[in-house]
Amino acid sequence: MSAHREETVRRLAAPDIAARKGGVPIVCLTAYTAPVAAALDDACDVLLVGDSVGMVVHGLPNTVGVTMEMMILHGQAVMRGSKKAMVVVDMPFGSYEASHEEAYANAVRIMKETGAQAVKVESGPTVPETIAYLTRRGVPVMGHVGLRPQAVLLEGGFKAKGKDDAGRAKVLEEARLTAEAGAFAIVVEGVAESLAREVTESVSVPTIGIGASAGCDGQVLVVDDMLGLFDWTPKFVRRYADLKGEIERAAAQYASDVRDRSFPGPAETYYAKKP
Protein backbone atom coordinates (compact mmCIF):
# COMPACT_ATOMS: atom_id res chain seq x y z
CA MET A 1 0.00 0.00 0.00
CA SER A 2 1.26 3.45 -0.84
CA ALA A 3 2.54 5.47 2.10
CA HIS A 4 0.85 8.53 0.66
CA ARG A 5 -2.91 8.93 0.43
CA GLU A 6 -4.62 11.59 -1.56
CA GLU A 7 -6.70 13.68 0.83
CA THR A 8 -10.40 13.53 0.05
CA VAL A 9 -12.24 16.84 0.20
CA ARG A 10 -15.95 16.53 0.96
CA ARG A 11 -18.01 18.77 -1.27
CA LEU A 12 -20.78 20.77 0.40
CA ALA A 13 -24.35 19.74 -0.41
CA ALA A 14 -27.91 20.95 0.12
CA PRO A 15 -28.18 19.84 3.79
CA ASP A 16 -24.99 21.75 4.65
CA ILE A 17 -26.35 24.96 3.16
CA ALA A 18 -29.82 24.49 4.67
CA ALA A 19 -28.21 24.11 8.10
CA ARG A 20 -26.65 27.57 7.83
CA LYS A 21 -29.97 29.36 8.44
CA GLY A 22 -29.30 32.19 10.88
CA GLY A 23 -25.63 31.26 11.22
CA VAL A 24 -22.41 32.37 9.56
CA PRO A 25 -23.45 34.04 6.27
CA ILE A 26 -23.31 31.85 3.17
CA VAL A 27 -20.73 32.96 0.59
CA CYS A 28 -21.78 32.47 -3.02
CA LEU A 29 -20.38 33.71 -6.33
CA THR A 30 -21.18 32.83 -9.89
CA ALA A 31 -18.64 30.78 -11.83
CA TYR A 32 -18.62 29.70 -15.46
CA THR A 33 -15.14 28.30 -16.16
CA ALA A 34 -12.78 25.78 -14.57
CA PRO A 35 -9.92 28.22 -13.79
CA VAL A 36 -12.21 30.74 -12.12
CA ALA A 37 -14.02 27.99 -10.20
CA ALA A 38 -10.65 26.75 -8.91
CA ALA A 39 -9.72 30.26 -7.78
CA LEU A 40 -13.05 30.78 -5.98
CA ASP A 41 -13.40 27.33 -4.45
CA ASP A 42 -11.64 27.90 -1.12
CA ALA A 43 -13.51 31.13 -0.35
CA CYS A 44 -17.02 30.07 -1.40
CA ASP A 45 -19.67 27.81 0.08
CA VAL A 46 -21.66 27.80 -3.17
CA LEU A 47 -20.64 28.31 -6.78
CA LEU A 48 -23.66 29.26 -8.88
CA VAL A 49 -23.45 28.46 -12.57
CA GLY A 50 -25.92 31.22 -13.36
CA ASP A 51 -27.74 31.75 -16.61
CA SER A 52 -26.09 35.17 -16.36
CA VAL A 53 -23.37 33.35 -18.32
CA GLY A 54 -25.36 34.27 -21.42
CA MET A 55 -24.78 37.96 -20.76
CA VAL A 56 -21.34 38.10 -19.16
CA VAL A 57 -19.60 35.40 -21.21
CA HIS A 58 -21.58 35.08 -24.44
CA GLY A 59 -22.60 38.72 -24.85
CA LEU A 60 -26.37 38.16 -24.98
CA PRO A 61 -28.67 41.09 -24.07
CA ASN A 62 -30.47 39.05 -21.39
CA THR A 63 -30.76 35.49 -20.09
CA VAL A 64 -33.71 34.45 -22.25
CA GLY A 65 -31.49 33.06 -25.01
CA VAL A 66 -29.51 30.75 -22.74
CA THR A 67 -29.84 27.04 -23.60
CA MET A 68 -29.60 23.76 -21.74
CA GLU A 69 -26.44 22.97 -23.68
CA MET A 70 -24.79 26.19 -22.50
CA MET A 71 -25.67 25.53 -18.87
CA ILE A 72 -24.43 21.95 -19.03
CA LEU A 73 -21.16 22.94 -20.72
CA HIS A 74 -20.38 25.58 -18.10
CA GLY A 75 -21.62 23.37 -15.26
CA GLN A 76 -19.16 20.68 -16.32
CA ALA A 77 -16.33 23.21 -16.37
CA VAL A 78 -17.12 24.52 -12.89
CA MET A 79 -17.35 21.01 -11.46
CA ARG A 80 -13.95 20.15 -12.93
CA GLY A 81 -12.38 23.28 -11.47
CA SER A 82 -13.80 23.03 -7.95
CA LYS A 83 -13.56 20.49 -5.14
CA LYS A 84 -15.19 21.87 -1.99
CA ALA A 85 -17.96 24.32 -2.87
CA MET A 86 -21.47 23.18 -3.65
CA VAL A 87 -22.23 23.71 -7.34
CA VAL A 88 -25.73 24.85 -8.30
CA VAL A 89 -26.75 25.15 -11.96
CA ASP A 90 -29.51 27.47 -13.17
CA MET A 91 -32.28 25.87 -15.20
CA PRO A 92 -32.58 28.13 -18.25
CA PHE A 93 -35.73 29.86 -19.47
CA GLY A 94 -38.10 27.36 -21.09
CA SER A 95 -36.61 24.27 -19.47
CA TYR A 96 -38.99 23.88 -16.51
CA GLU A 97 -42.20 25.81 -17.22
CA ALA A 98 -44.12 23.60 -19.66
CA SER A 99 -44.73 20.58 -17.43
CA HIS A 100 -43.48 18.89 -14.29
CA GLU A 101 -42.27 15.95 -16.34
CA GLU A 102 -40.19 18.13 -18.66
CA ALA A 103 -38.76 20.02 -15.69
CA TYR A 104 -37.76 16.74 -14.06
CA ALA A 105 -36.16 15.40 -17.24
CA ASN A 106 -34.15 18.58 -17.72
CA ALA A 107 -33.12 18.81 -14.06
CA VAL A 108 -31.94 15.20 -14.06
CA ARG A 109 -30.06 15.78 -17.30
CA ILE A 110 -28.25 18.77 -15.79
CA MET A 111 -27.29 16.87 -12.66
CA LYS A 112 -26.21 13.71 -14.48
CA GLU A 113 -24.20 15.47 -17.19
CA THR A 114 -22.54 18.04 -14.91
CA GLY A 115 -22.32 16.27 -11.56
CA ALA A 116 -23.73 19.40 -9.87
CA GLN A 117 -25.36 19.13 -6.46
CA ALA A 118 -28.54 21.11 -7.23
CA VAL A 119 -30.46 23.19 -9.74
CA LYS A 120 -32.00 26.64 -9.35
CA VAL A 121 -35.34 27.89 -10.69
CA GLU A 122 -36.94 31.34 -10.69
CA SER A 123 -40.31 31.93 -9.05
CA GLY A 124 -43.61 32.07 -10.88
CA PRO A 125 -47.27 31.07 -10.42
CA THR A 126 -46.69 27.35 -11.03
CA VAL A 127 -43.08 27.05 -9.91
CA PRO A 128 -43.72 25.95 -6.28
CA GLU A 129 -45.57 22.92 -7.64
CA THR A 130 -42.61 22.20 -9.90
CA ILE A 131 -40.18 22.50 -6.99
CA ALA A 132 -42.28 20.07 -4.96
CA TYR A 133 -42.38 17.64 -7.90
CA LEU A 134 -38.59 17.77 -8.26
CA THR A 135 -37.70 17.53 -4.58
CA ARG A 136 -40.05 14.58 -4.05
CA ARG A 137 -38.04 12.81 -6.74
CA GLY A 138 -34.66 13.53 -5.24
CA VAL A 139 -33.63 16.73 -7.02
CA PRO A 140 -32.28 19.42 -4.65
CA VAL A 141 -33.68 22.81 -5.70
CA MET A 142 -32.66 26.37 -4.88
CA GLY A 143 -35.46 28.91 -5.34
CA HIS A 144 -35.29 32.52 -6.54
CA VAL A 145 -37.77 35.30 -5.68
CA GLY A 146 -37.98 39.04 -6.23
CA LEU A 147 -36.44 40.34 -9.44
CA ARG A 148 -36.55 37.56 -12.04
CA PRO A 149 -34.04 38.02 -14.88
CA GLN A 150 -35.80 35.39 -17.02
CA ALA A 151 -38.96 37.54 -16.96
CA VAL A 152 -37.20 40.66 -18.28
CA LEU A 153 -39.15 40.69 -21.56
CA LEU A 154 -42.48 40.21 -19.80
CA GLU A 155 -41.79 42.90 -17.21
CA GLY A 156 -40.04 45.42 -19.44
CA GLY A 157 -36.58 45.36 -17.90
CA PHE A 158 -34.66 44.63 -14.73
CA LYS A 159 -36.88 46.25 -12.10
CA ALA A 160 -36.68 46.04 -8.31
CA LYS A 161 -39.61 44.28 -6.66
CA GLY A 162 -41.78 44.83 -3.61
CA LYS A 163 -41.98 48.61 -3.87
CA ASP A 164 -45.61 48.78 -2.71
CA ASP A 165 -47.78 46.73 -0.34
CA ALA A 166 -49.07 44.45 -3.10
CA GLY A 167 -45.57 43.85 -4.40
CA ARG A 168 -44.24 43.09 -0.93
CA ALA A 169 -47.05 40.64 -0.28
CA LYS A 170 -46.35 38.88 -3.58
CA VAL A 171 -42.64 38.43 -2.82
CA LEU A 172 -43.41 37.18 0.70
CA GLU A 173 -45.97 34.71 -0.65
CA GLU A 174 -43.58 33.45 -3.33
CA ALA A 175 -40.89 32.92 -0.71
CA ARG A 176 -43.28 31.09 1.62
CA LEU A 177 -44.51 28.78 -1.14
CA THR A 178 -40.99 28.16 -2.40
CA ALA A 179 -39.79 27.12 1.06
CA GLU A 180 -42.85 24.98 1.71
CA ALA A 181 -42.34 23.24 -1.64
CA GLY A 182 -38.99 21.94 -0.45
CA ALA A 183 -36.34 24.37 -1.70
CA PHE A 184 -33.22 24.14 0.48
CA ALA A 185 -32.39 27.84 0.00
CA ILE A 186 -33.82 30.89 -1.76
CA VAL A 187 -32.07 33.63 -3.72
CA VAL A 188 -33.71 37.00 -3.00
CA GLU A 189 -32.94 39.55 -5.71
CA GLY A 190 -33.59 43.26 -6.11
CA VAL A 191 -35.72 44.09 -3.07
CA ALA A 192 -35.53 46.72 -0.32
CA GLU A 193 -33.70 45.92 2.92
CA SER A 194 -36.87 45.80 5.02
CA LEU A 195 -38.49 43.29 2.67
CA ALA A 196 -35.34 41.17 2.48
CA ARG A 197 -35.26 40.96 6.27
CA GLU A 198 -38.97 40.13 6.41
CA VAL A 199 -38.54 37.35 3.84
CA THR A 200 -35.54 35.98 5.74
CA GLU A 201 -37.43 35.97 9.03
CA SER A 202 -40.54 34.42 7.50
CA VAL A 203 -39.00 31.29 5.92
CA SER A 204 -37.24 28.35 7.52
CA VAL A 205 -34.57 28.02 4.83
CA PRO A 206 -31.56 30.29 4.18
CA THR A 207 -31.95 33.32 1.95
CA ILE A 208 -29.09 34.41 -0.30
CA GLY A 209 -29.31 38.04 -1.32
CA ILE A 210 -28.26 39.88 -4.44
CA GLY A 211 -29.23 43.51 -4.26
CA ALA A 212 -31.20 42.62 -1.15
CA SER A 213 -29.10 44.01 1.74
CA ALA A 214 -27.15 42.30 4.50
CA GLY A 215 -30.43 41.14 6.02
CA CYS A 216 -30.22 37.80 4.20
CA ASP A 217 -28.52 34.60 5.36
CA GLY A 218 -25.87 34.93 2.65
CA GLN A 219 -24.83 36.86 -0.43
CA VAL A 220 -24.23 36.15 -4.12
CA LEU A 221 -22.71 38.34 -6.81
CA VAL A 222 -21.88 37.85 -10.46
CA VAL A 223 -18.13 37.25 -10.27
CA ASP A 224 -17.40 39.41 -13.33
CA ASP A 225 -19.10 42.38 -11.62
CA MET A 226 -17.23 41.80 -8.37
CA LEU A 227 -13.89 41.60 -10.20
CA GLY A 228 -14.50 44.76 -12.22
CA LEU A 229 -14.60 43.29 -15.72
CA PHE A 230 -17.22 45.77 -16.93
CA ASP A 231 -17.29 49.57 -17.11
CA TRP A 232 -20.74 49.79 -15.50
CA THR A 233 -21.25 48.56 -11.95
CA PRO A 234 -24.75 47.93 -10.52
CA LYS A 235 -25.60 49.82 -7.31
CA PHE A 236 -25.61 46.65 -5.22
CA VAL A 237 -22.13 45.51 -6.33
CA ARG A 238 -18.90 46.21 -4.46
CA ARG A 239 -15.90 45.96 -6.79
CA TYR A 240 -13.01 44.09 -5.20
CA ALA A 241 -10.67 44.39 -8.20
CA ASP A 242 -10.22 46.20 -11.52
CA LEU A 243 -9.51 43.26 -13.79
CA LYS A 244 -10.68 45.09 -16.90
CA GLY A 245 -8.06 47.74 -16.26
CA GLU A 246 -5.42 45.11 -15.51
CA ILE A 247 -6.23 43.22 -18.72
CA GLU A 248 -6.10 46.40 -20.78
CA ARG A 249 -2.75 47.38 -19.26
CA ALA A 250 -1.31 43.90 -19.77
CA ALA A 251 -2.53 43.75 -23.38
CA ALA A 252 -1.09 47.20 -24.12
CA GLN A 253 2.29 46.23 -22.66
CA TYR A 254 2.28 42.95 -24.60
CA ALA A 255 1.46 44.79 -27.83
CA SER A 256 4.28 47.26 -27.19
CA ASP A 257 6.79 44.48 -26.47
CA VAL A 258 5.82 42.58 -29.64
CA ARG A 259 6.06 45.67 -31.82
CA ASP A 260 9.47 46.71 -30.53
CA ARG A 261 10.67 43.08 -30.65
CA SER A 262 11.51 42.93 -26.95
CA PHE A 263 9.19 39.92 -26.70
CA PRO A 264 10.07 37.16 -26.92
CA GLY A 265 13.44 37.76 -25.30
CA PRO A 266 16.23 35.38 -24.36
CA ALA A 267 14.30 34.06 -21.34
CA GLU A 268 11.35 33.04 -23.54
CA THR A 269 13.37 31.64 -26.45
CA TYR A 270 14.53 28.08 -27.20
CA TYR A 271 18.09 27.62 -28.44
CA ALA A 272 19.76 24.69 -30.16
CA LYS A 273 22.36 22.89 -28.09
CA LYS A 274 25.91 23.52 -29.18
CA PRO A 275 27.62 20.42 -30.56
From Swiss-Prot:
Entries under Pfam families matching the protein: Pantoate_transf
Binding-site residues for 3-methyl-2-oxobutanoate, renumbered to this chain: 51-52, 90, 120
Which residues of the sequence carry a binding annotation for Mg(2+)? Answer: 51, 90, 122
Provide a GO biological process annotation.
Answer: pantothenate biosynthetic process
Which reaction equation describes what this protein catalyses? 3-methyl-2-oxobutanoate + (6R)-5,10-methylene-5,6,7,8-tetrahydrofolate + H2O = 2-dehydropantoate + (6S)-5,6,7,8-tetrahydrofolate
User: Does the keyword Transferase feature in the UniProt annotation?
Assistant: yes
Which Gene Ontology molecular function entries are recorded, alphabetically?
3-methyl-2-oxobutanoate hydroxymethyltransferase activity; magnesium ion binding
- Its EC number is 2.1.2.11
Q: Where in the cell is it found?
A: Cytoplasm
Q: Which cofactor does it need?
A: Mg(2+)
* InterPro entries in the record: Pantoate_hydroxy_MeTrfase, Pyrv/PenolPyrv_kinase-like_dom, Pyrv_kinase-like_dom_sf
Q: Which UniProt keywords apply?
A: Cytoplasm, Magnesium, Metal-binding, Pantothenate biosynthesis, Transferase
Q: How is the cofactor bound?
A: Binds 1 Mg(2+) ion per subunit.
Q: State the GO CC annotations.
A: cytoplasm
Pathway listed for it is: Cofactor biosynthesis; (R)-pantothenate biosynthesis; (R)-pantoate from 3-methyl-2-oxobutanoate: step 1/2
Residue positions of the active site: 189
Q: What family is this protein classified in?
A: Belongs to the PanB family.
Q: What does this protein do?
A: Catalyzes the reversible reaction in which hydroxymethyl group from 5,10-methylenetetrahydrofolate is transferred onto alpha-ketoisovalerate to form ketopantoate.
Subunit field text: Homodecamer; pentamer of dimers.
By what name is this protein known? 3-methyl-2-oxobutanoate hydroxymethyltransferase
The gene from which this protein is expressed is panB
